[in-house]
């Protein structure tokens, strides 16, 4: 099934996040950037986990990486909690959601059609827009978050992996010369005893590239997801 916005251009724009980054630093963690995700309430500082006192700390919300990102990094990966939005029928549009709980909105094709951009401020202080090129529900351990610098062959392999595993086929060109961004959160989509992750992958907008939405087409990877959603499981009480 093909979903298309017929060349519609996103109005998602860059915001100066510097004051929020400085405020986040007052909690004592190693703040390495900021992230906002179009169509969601995800608007969080990014923390280097190696210096985080406690990833379950309740003083403020954040996403974290297990690597040491710097100006040489070419693939950033960040993780954040999903405590409530874990069922096979994720809630969409609930502004009481926290951390990366609203990342699950991308499991719905109509949402992915109309929300395809991420604002990312990196360790060098540069803020840029990234374009989503893959969304996947995967049985993996998020170990990608321990690395942030890759050679050309490794990046080519990862890009192929993302496109092979994505539940959508999106007409976005991605190469090893692009800066990459990966966002992970946990889910119990297939039940409490499984160890699946929900992953959204994006690459930095190229110089002169517009922000027209790409086409979004569900593929064979979405068939099992769609069947599970029809079973009607709801979120657990917390």
Feature locations, PLM:
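Solvent-exposed, non-transmembrane regions of membrane-associated and secreted proteins
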Residues: 1-238
């Amino acid at each position: 099934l093909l979903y298309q916005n017929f060349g519609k251009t996103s109005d998602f724009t860059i915001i100066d996040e510097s004051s929020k980054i400085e405020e986040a630093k007052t909690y004592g963690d190693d703040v390495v950037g900021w992230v906002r995700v179009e169509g969601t309430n995800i608007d969080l500082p990014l923390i280097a986990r190696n210096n985080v006192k406690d990833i379950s700390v309740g003083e403020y919300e954040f996403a974290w990486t297990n690597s040491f990102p710097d100006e040489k990094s070419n693939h950033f990966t960040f993780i954040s909690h999903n405590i409530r939005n874990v069922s096979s029928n994720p809630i969409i549009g609930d502004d009481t959601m926290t951390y990366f709980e609203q990342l699950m909105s991308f499991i719905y094709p109509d949402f992915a059609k109309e929300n395809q951009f991420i604002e990312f401020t990196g360790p060098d202080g540069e803020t840029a827009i990234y374009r989503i090129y893959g969304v996947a529900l995967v049985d993996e351990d998020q170990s990608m978050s321990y690395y942030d610098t890759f050679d050309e062959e490794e990046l080519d392999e990862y890009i192929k992996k993302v496109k092979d595993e994505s539940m959508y086929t999106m007409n976005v060109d991605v190469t090893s010369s692009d800066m990459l961004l990966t966002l992970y959160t946990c889910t119990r989509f297939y039940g409490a005893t499984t160890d699946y992750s929900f992953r959204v992958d994006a690459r930095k907008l190229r110089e002169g590239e517009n922000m027209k939405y790409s086409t979004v087409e569900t593929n064979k990877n979405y068939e099992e997801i769609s069947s599970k959603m029809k079973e009607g499981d709801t979120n657990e009480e917390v």
